[in-house]
Amino acid sequence: MFLVDSHCHLDGLDYQSLHKNVDDVLAKAAARDVKFCLAVATTLPGYRTMRELVGVRDNVVFSCGVHPLNQDEEYDVDDLRRLAAEEGVVAMGETGLDYFYTPETKPRQQESFRNHIRIGRELNKPVIVHTLSLIHISEPT
């Protein structure tokens, strides 16, 4: 048996004091029977950085998206579509709705979430959804 890390942020690890590099991280994971990783992006610049950092590997695939807490800057939807269509990208996201920390970006979060779902449908890719503080929401998004 082996394990799959279905949601890791390889671009957000401490490469100064905890890990030497991505090879080191993946070797440590493999030593604990984690043989495959889905590297999840939270911004489009972060996705690009992560792709460059990780490179092409047999044991890592990617998602491409904009996290709801990263809606302070606009992004190009066509850029999202183009990046999400790249080889090795198997999912959209991390996207979703998070009104707990940034309720002021609610309209932007909703529009972004719709864009991710729409592109996911176009590209036939699943969507990684982040939700927080949505239990009592009764309005449509």
What are these regions (language model features)?
Residues 1-138:
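Mid-domain alpha/beta scaffold segments of enzyme catalytic cores
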